[in-house]
Amino acid sequence: LDGIAEFMLEDSRRATIERIAALPQETAEGEMTMDGFEKPITLKVSVSVEGDKIVSDFTGSSGLDKKGINCPLVYAKAYACYALKVAIAPEIPNNAASLAPFEITAPENTIVNALHPAPVALRHIMGHFVPDVVFNAFDKIVPDLVPAEGAGCLCNFQVSLRPRTDAPAPANARRNEVLTFNSG
């Protein structure tokens, strides 16, 4: 199995790098402003195709918000990578190797790089707009490749399995929930 795993990772990495290398070596910016709780929130990104990698830098995005809509960088990275992957390599397996060529940065203590103890419980409110701002920039490099702006790239599928406290025997009764909404 190790050989198969190594092949899959290397093949994914190589395929993603080949896609990136075929792109114009350019830089473009994207920006969007959304309603905040107390003031408007700006998401800004500079996307650069640099050889065999794509660098996305969120310098210029708003600072921290007092409410929990701040994103830890790992959350913003996930959604920025999602946008790039959708645009250039949707059929290539999604794994560490295929995501490695995407470098995502943001200044500390901004809306997309919140450090402890910044409130982040509602990070999805801003985080789900990250793909749209990346699409906005990337469309300037490769026009007509990215999807049109939609529902903030929301595509939520949640599954839960919890013990039932209201159920009689058997003692191991479970409640199942499946929630789906939005389509990205």
Task: Annotate each PLM feature.
Residues 1-184:
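Glycine/proline-enriched, intrinsically flexible loops and inter-domain linkers
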